[in-house]
UniProtKB/Swiss-Prot annotation:
Gene3D superfamilies: Transcription factor LuxR-like, autoinducer-binding domain, Winged helix-like DNA-binding domain superfamily/Winged helix DNA-binding domain. This is Transcriptional activator protein PhzR. InterPro entries: Sig_transdc_resp-reg_C-effctor (IPR016032), TF_LuxR_autoind-bd_dom (IPR005143), TF_LuxR_autoind-bd_dom_sf (IPR036693), Tscrpt_reg_LuxR_C (IPR000792), WH-like_DNA-bd_sf (IPR036388). Positive regulator of phenazine antibiotic production. May activate the phenazine biosynthetic genes by binding to a DNA sequence upstream of them, or to an intermediate gene which, in turn, interacts with them. GO terms for biological process: antibiotic biosynthetic process; quorum sensing; regulation of DNA-templated transcription. Residues 177-242 form the HTH luxR-type domain. Transmembrane segments: none annotated. Belongs to the autoinducer-regulated transcriptional regulatory protein family.
């Protein structure tokens, strides 16, 4: 059983890594996670990861026990694009408390979440070694989170989110693929950089001392590796993903 005293004694990072180690699949992970979080008076949790690309329809992965009808609605409405907790997670690793003010620019999202018993909560961003962003969301139907409680929860949620991201990445094949780095050769990186600077294939060929066909060959490989249909999209994705 989850004990606050044990977490404080071991340190929250060590504690959550140790209890998550018991889980052999996502069902077991969810049970262990809920047992811990219900001691903190939360009814629901979701661990979400949003792909950087494609820009207009990013892939969203959600794990936990959020109501299924809400998850389906969130995906169908593409709420990840306007969710302020997702936007926050891209620029900060600090937790953020839900409030009417936070969701003032997306009232439909906030209203529908409340209708699904997700009334009071917080979001805790975390980052893995590939720089991918995950967001842990904790929610409950009743009892607003006071500022004092929020402060006390900060070290707990930070440790939980980091351990959860590592465990989910180990268990789920789609997330492992999502977290896999694309490997570009040195020549491909040069082609990407020169293209980003506005150079044509002919100009890049002159600069690099190769023929235009060779540059175009590198472009095709880059597009295949990064999942782009043309070189403009390839450069945009490469910049967004931090490859150049």
């Amino acid at each position: 059983m989850f004990k606050m005293e044990l977490g404080q004694l071991l340190g929250w990072d060590a504690y959550f890594y140790s209890i998550f180690a018991q889980a052999m699949n996502m069902e077991e992970f969810t049970v262990v996670a809920l047992r811990a979080l219900r001691e903190l008076r939360f009814d629901f949790f979701a661990y979400g990861m949003c792909s950087v690309t494609p820009f207009m329809r990013p892939k969203t992965y959600m794990y936990g026990n959020y109501p299924e009808h809400w998850l389906q609605r969130y995906q169908a409405a593409n709420y990840a694009l306007i969710d302020p907790t997702v936007k926050h997670s891209k620029v900060s690793s600090a937790p953020i408390l839900w409030s009417n003010e936070l969701f003032r620019n997306c009232p439909d999202l906030w209203s529908e979440a409340n209708d699904s018993s997700l009334c009071h909560g917080l979001a805790q961003p975390s980052f893995n070694t590939q720089g991918r962003v995950g967001v842990l969301s904790l929610a409950r139907k009743d009892n607003a989170i006071s500022l004092q409680e929020f402060e006390a929860l900060k070290p707990v949620t930070k440790a939980f989110a980091a351990a959860a991201l590592e465990k989910i990445s180990a268990l789920e094949t789609d997330v492992r693929a999502f977290n896999t780095d694309v490997e570009f050769s040195e020549r491909e990186c040069d082609v990407l950089r020169w293209t980003a600077d506005g150079k044509t294939s002919e100009e890049i060929g002159v600069i690099m001392g190769v023929c235009t066909d060779t540059v175009n060959y590198h472009h095709r490989n880059i597009q295949r590796k990064i999942g782009a249909s043309n070189r403009v999209q390839a450069v945009s994705y490469a910049v967004a993903l931090g490859y150049i």
